[in-house]
Amino acid sequence: MTGSPLPARERAIVLRKERLGGDHVRLVLDAPQIAPWTRAGQFVHVLCPTEASLQHFAEAKGRVLAPGSRLADSSHFPLLRRPLSVHRLCGPQYAADRLRAGPHSPSTTSWPRRCSGLELLLRVVGSGTAALAEREAGMGVDLIGPLGNGFSIAEEGQEAVLVAGGIGVAPLLALAQELRLLGRPVTALVGALDLARMPLGVDPQVDRSFADDQLEFMLREFGEIGVRSVLVSEREHGMLVTEYLERFLERKRHEPLVLYACGPKAMLAEVARLAGRRPCQVLLEERMACGVGACRGCVVKVRGEGRTRFRTVCKDGPVFRAQDVLWEEMQ
């Protein structure tokens, strides 16, 4: 279910920028038009170009560019907006001590929420994200949002299990906030190539806790809101997060669980397989242009009403039921 009736375009203001491990950057933004309506799993479409790149584009417009010239290389023109999941919401309702205590009265969980800030977590991979990572406190960021359909919240009595791979952890922190606001028990299983590239704060006892197979408050951002977590490092532990998930599900085989996942497609396909008949929602990440379903550049095949259908990740998703996605068709 989407948040606001219509997405808003807003010039959000950067309140703080944090450089994290592995080329990750966290931007804390003041976005009073978008933040109160944002639901976990939704995204904002961000205009990333620097003023310099736009100036170069304006100067080049209307003339033929020589092949091989710097301005002819489209990588220097991050003109398309970048879809970025909302990482965390900021406001009195989302204070860490309140989320640890949860649940809250219906009046505090209705829409719009009493918050005006949101956080974006990004990994610098190209010219667009590099330009966005250059924003400093006081500078503006052009956003459209909230966009897409977010997560459906676990029913009372179900434990929510969040499974993240790499930068896929970004939208799951906002989901953890939402679940804790309603008092749901939450466990986060987070996979990373190595500990140094983890974009969240890591407890120094992570290796001991992993060896003891104990779920502790190992990731700071999850722990401070009452979510137990385990960090699985492929390099340090020689294990994928899906392998740990299989072990975890075996221990919890008689307990009511609902799974949520975001990460590489191969990881999501394996999470869907391991989930079996358990309810499981996945957030898909696709390249997209318009962000509103018009260009149909981000379609995926899903099962629906007895036949295969094409759905857009930006408008129909980015969250889908794992059992509906035709994983064998995913590239």
Question: Residue ranges of each PLM-predicted region?
Answer:
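Short, surface-exposed amphipathic charged segments that create phosphate/polyanion-binding patches used
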Residues: 103, 203, 242-249, 294-302
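FNR/FR-type flavoprotein reductase catalytic core
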Residues: 127-289
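Local cysteine-cluster metal-coordination motifs and their immediate loop/turn environment
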Residues: 171, 265-266, 285-319
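SAM/dcSAM-binding transferase cores
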Residues: 312-316, 322-331
